């Protein structure tokens, strides 16, 4: 990735993050975060990795709502990136790396507890309410 495409990717990530947080008012969009943006060398396509918290159904609904809002997102990008002749096409990709890292962390915690001879700790969500 060239320095220019990398800088543009960071700028798109910052702008889209602000738009998702402050401007997008769709109630179907849950807690979504722009994790990263890769821009192709010809600046025609921006692959936007988005992490969404929630159940699989909520994630699917959020991604569908974001797909429907792509026109708005691209228009707002064009306003912010007015120095570009052409704003890249947005390709939204659900990023599950956070979920995967949490899963690996839980497996490591259980393995460490088994080595120590104590029962594995229960995840925060599984503890009974007091």
UniProtKB/Swiss-Prot annotation:
GO molecular function per UniProt: ribosomal small subunit binding
* Name of the gene encoding the protein in the UniProt record: rbfA
Stored SUPFAM superfamilies: Ribosome-binding factor A, RbfA (SSF89919)
Q: What does this protein do?
A: One of several proteins that assist in the late maturation steps of the functional core of the 30S ribosomal subunit. Associates with free 30S ribosomal subunits (but not with 30S subunits that are part of 70S ribosomes or polysomes). Required for efficient processing of 16S rRNA. May interact with the 5'-terminal helix region of 16S rRNA.
Which branch of life, at top level?
Answer: Bacteria
User: PANTHER family of this UniProt entry?
Assistant: RIBOSOME-BINDING FACTOR A, CHLOROPLASTIC-RELATED
- The molecule here is called Ribosome-binding factor A
Mind telling me which residue stretches traverse the membrane in this protein? none
């Amino acid at each position: 990735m060239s320095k220019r495409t990398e800088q543009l990717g960071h700028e798109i990530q910052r702008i889209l993050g602000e738009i998702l947080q402050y401007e997008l008012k769709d109630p179907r969009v849950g807690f979504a975060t722009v994790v990263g943006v890769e821009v192709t060398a010809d600046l025609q396509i921006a692959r936007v990795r988005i992490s969404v918290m929630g159940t699989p159904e909520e994630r699917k609904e959020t991604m569908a709502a974001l797909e429907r809002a792509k026109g708005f997102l691209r228009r707002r990008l064009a306003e912010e990136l007015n120095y570009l002749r052409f704003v890249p096409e947005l390709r939204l990709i659900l990023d599950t790396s956070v979920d995967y890292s949490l899963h690996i962390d839980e497996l490591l915690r259980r393995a460490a507890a088994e080595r120590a001879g104590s029962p594995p700790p229960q995840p925060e969500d599984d503890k009974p309410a007091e």
